[in-house]
From Swiss-Prot:
BP-aspect Gene Ontology terms: translation
Xref: Gene3D superfamilies: 3.100.10.10
One of the record's GO cellular component terms: cytosolic large ribosomal subunit
Keywords: Ribonucleoprotein, Ribosomal protein, RNA-binding, rRNA-binding
Claim: RNA-binding is one of the keywords in the record: yes
Region (Disordered): 1-54
Record organism: Mycobacterium ulcerans (strain Agy99)
Pfam families hit by this protein: Ribosomal_L27A
Family statement: Belongs to the universal ribosomal protein uL15 family.
Subunit structure: Part of the 50S ribosomal subunit.
InterPro entries attached to this UniProt entry: Ribosomal_uL15 (IPR030878), Ribosomal_uL15/eL18 (IPR021131), Ribosomal_uL15/eL18_sf (IPR036227), Ribosomal_uL15_bac-type (IPR005749), Ribosomal_uL15_CS (IPR001196)
Gene name, Swiss-Prot/TrEMBL: rplO
UniProt function note: Binds to the 23S rRNA.
Record's protein name: Large ribosomal subunit protein uL15
Length: 146
């Protein structure tokens, strides 16, 4: 005989009805699982209450200031990083920086002037700092903003 889906039944005793407490002396009435006397037997205690100890939400400092939701975040690449990643120079764009692992793809790139640049590099990025512009042009390269 094969078992069919409509023949399946839960094991006896596995499905018992939910016990409704506090509904008469005969069935978990009277204290209804709350024990005897005390605050927790008589009313609900707030979840933040820690027995008189200063609660954690009052011990921690308040959050101050605010975070601008419309701020544009740039991935930062320093001139020194470009000199290290491209020692022979040439043209460097966002795609080349992504390929070398300097920045993540689909991100805005800002070039900063930390480090030294000695080779001629033509860089294309979204933003440049003043010192980065100076170093790139001093080395004979060019700067192009997207």
């Amino acid at each position: 005989m094969t078992i069919k889906l409509h023949d399946l039944r839960p094991a006896p005793g596995s499905k018992t009805p939910r016990t409704r407490v506090g509904r008469g002396e005969g069935s978990k009435g009277k204290t209804a699982g709350r024990g005897t006397k005390g605050t927790k037997a008589r009313k609900q205690v707030p979840t933040t209450f820690e027995g008189g100890q200063m609660p954690i939400h009052m011990r921690l400092p308040k959050l101050k200031g605010f975070r601008n939701r419309f701020r544009t975040e740039y991935e930062i690449v320093n001139v020194g990083d470009i000199a290290r990643l491209f020692p022979e120079g040439g043209t460097v764009g966002v795609d080349e920086l992504v390929a070398k692992g300097a920045v993540r793809k689909n991100s805005l790139v800002k070039v900063l002037g930390d480090g030294k640049l000695t080779v001629k590099v033509d860089i294309t990025a979204h933003k440049f700092s003043g010192s980065a512009r100076e170093q790139i042009t001093a080395a004979g390269g060019s700067v192009t903003e997207l």
